[in-house]
Amino acid sequence: MKKVSIYTDGACSGNPGDGGWGAILIYGNHEKEVSGFEKDTTNNRMELVAAINALKMLKEPCEVDLYSDSAYLVNGFLQNWVEKWKKNGWKTSNKEEVKNMELWQELDRLSNIHKIRWIKVKGHSDNEYNNRCDKLATDEIKKNSKK
């Protein structure tokens, strides 16, 4: 299985508001940057979308180290939220529908294809790749938002 590192970040101008996401995939000496934009979204959705789109770039099952500064994204798997939600019919402990359910379901599907290690990094720190992802995300907002 190929080993790939993925860094992701999401950003929002207003919450909700215009959002951007960015990701960097690293395999050996190769790097690929991807990014995108959505209107009327939230920062949490952008964090999930960044991870989904990065994982969808992989053409075969891989061992993935996925780095994110989003506790929301990382804890979904490290704290077993996703497993609990699935057992509860995608309802929270308060019997409410899980927010961003369709995105969590897609991440769950992708996590069954790839062997993913979810790694929390400190946001806006000295992590070069996280900072680059943040710039990709915010550049998408600047490029696509109405002035």
UniProtKB/Swiss-Prot annotation:
InterPro entries: RNase_H, RNaseH-like_sf, RNaseH_domain, RNaseH_sf, RNaseHI
Location(s) in or outside the cell: Cytoplasm
CDD domains listed in its UniProt record: RNase_HI_prokaryote_like
EC number: 3.1.26.4
GO MF: magnesium ion binding; nucleic acid binding; RNA-DNA hybrid ribonuclease activity
Any one Gene Ontology cellular component term annotated for this protein: cytoplasm
Domain RNase H type-1 residue range list: 1-142
Cofactor(s) needed: Mg(2+)
Keyword terms, alphabetized: Cytoplasm, Endonuclease, Hydrolase, Magnesium, Metal-binding, Nuclease
One record GO biological process: DNA replication, removal of RNA primer
Source organism, top-level taxon: Bacteria
Record: residues binding Mg(2+) 1: D9, E47, D69
Presence of keyword Hydrolase: yes
EC category: hydrolase
Known catalytic reactions: Endonucleolytic cleavage to 5'-phosphomonoester
UniProt: Mg(2+) 2 binding residues: D9, D134
Location (main, coarse): cytoplasm
Subunit and interaction comment: Monomer.
Protein purpose: Endonuclease that specifically degrades the RNA of RNA-DNA hybrids.
Name the record gives this protein: Ribonuclease H
Species assigned in the record: Acetivibrio thermocellus (strain ATCC 27405 / DSM 1237 / JCM 9322 / NBRC 103400 / NCIMB 10682 / NRRL B-4536 / VPI 7372) (Clostridium thermocellum)
Lineage of the species this protein comes from: Bacteria, Bacillati, Bacillota, Clostridia, Eubacteriales
Name of encoding gene: rnhA
